[in-house]
């Protein structure tokens, strides 16, 4: 059965189709005969309890520089849609949170993927703390003294904003680095929220693995290796993608968290693993499926739509 699918995303003109997961999901939906609609989060509205968006009919093509066509914008009641993909990138701020409140009003009659209430209640750097034995030593605080004590305990640490994304604002403070005090001052000025400190994992030099799970089951993995001059492995900031397979420890991690992901209705999730430790659970807009398909032929977009269609 053909579905009406609205994609809530950053504007389609801004995506890099070579590595964009939302684009891959849209291509697969179109291939299956589903009707695609596009809208940016700032086109979402609610009036008198009716949730709507100014949507444009969308066609996509796997052609750089000519990857989309949009129709004329039309205000549509989103209950007319069968599926909405919640796919705009973080930051996970009040704008983002407000969209989850609005979309929650129409879910699950209109299937919102991922479930907007659970997306709101599962920020990736906090959700992961539900599994403390699977992650490195971690501190969430805005108290500078707590961070300095943590640094004295572990020497090398990572300091990053609690609601950042794409590697922005991530700092490696090696033992003896004298920048911690000034960094804490800067973080206090830039961020109203607490920030996060973690024990530095030296295994990151060998890569930070992104594992994709569909309905709580691992379906593919990608290793991201940082450059020689950067502590971050995110592909947005120059991390090099490499083909990878799951280790026994990574399968153990997936088996532990899988039931919780299914219980919360998370269809598409990406987790980050360094060595033996999980560092994040990404439920907002996980990436990596295009790279995985290029490396080993696994069509994760097809597995995603199989899971979505089974719910319709």
From Swiss-Prot:
The ATP-grasp domain covers which part of the protein? 125-309
Keyword annotations for this protein, in alphabetical order, are:
ATP-binding, Glutathione biosynthesis, Ligase, Magnesium, Manganese, Metal-binding, Nucleotide-binding
Which parts of the sequence bind ATP? 151-207
Q: What is its EC number?
A: 6.3.2.3
Entry note: cofactor: Binds 1 Mg(2+) or Mn(2+) ion per subunit.
Gene Ontology cellular-component terms for this entry are: cytoplasm
List the SUPFAM superfamilies hit by this protein, alphabetically. Glutathione synthetase ATP-binding domain-like (SSF56059), PreATP-grasp domain (SSF52440)
- Residues noted as binding Mg(2+) in the record, renumbered to the chain: 280, 282
Q: NCBIfam families given for it?
A: glut_syn, PRK05246.1
**Family note:** Belongs to the prokaryotic GSH synthase family.
- Protein name, UniProt field: Glutathione synthetase
What is the protein's species of origin?
Answer: Brucella suis biovar 1 (strain 1330)
Name of the encoding gene: gshb
């Amino acid at each position: 059965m053909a579905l009406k699918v609205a994609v809530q995303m950053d504007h389609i003109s801004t995506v890099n189709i070579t590595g964009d997961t939302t684009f891959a999901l849209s291509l697969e939906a179109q291939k299956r005969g589903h009707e695609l609609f596009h809208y940016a989060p700032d086109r979402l509205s609610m009036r008198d309890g009716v949730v709507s968006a100014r949507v444009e009919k969308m066609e996509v093509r796997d052609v750089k520089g000519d990857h989309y066509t949009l129709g004329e914008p039309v205000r549509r009641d989103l209950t007319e849609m069968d599926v909405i993909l919640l796919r705009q990138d973080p930051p996970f701020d009040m704008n983002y949170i407000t969209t989850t409140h609005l979309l929650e009003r129409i879910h699950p009659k209109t299937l919102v993927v991922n479930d907007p209430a659970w997306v709101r209640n599962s920020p990736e750097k906090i959700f992961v703390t539900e599994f403390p034995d699977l992650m490195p030593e971690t501190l969430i605080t805005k108290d500078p003294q707590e961070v300095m004590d943590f640094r004295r305990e572990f020497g090398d640490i990572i300091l990053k904003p609690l609601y950042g994304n794409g590697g922005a604002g991530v700092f490696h403070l090696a033992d003896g680095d004298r920048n911690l005090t000034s960094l804490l001052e800067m973080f206090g000025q830039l961020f109203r929220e607490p920030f996060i400190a973690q024990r530095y994992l030296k295994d990151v030099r060998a890569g930070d693995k992104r594992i994709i799970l569909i309905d709580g089951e691992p379906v593919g993995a990608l290793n991201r290796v940082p450059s020689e001059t950067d502590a971050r492995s995110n592909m947005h900031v120059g991390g090099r993608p490499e083909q990878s397979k799951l280790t026994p420890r990574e399968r153990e991690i997936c088996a532990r968290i899988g039931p919780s992901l299914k219980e919360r209705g998370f269809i598409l999730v990406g987790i980050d693993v360094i060595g033996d430790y999980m560092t994040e659970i990404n439920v907002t807009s996980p990436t990596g499926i295009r790279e995985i398909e290029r490396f080993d032929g696994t069509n994760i977009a097809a597995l995603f739509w199989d899971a979505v269609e089974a719910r319709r």
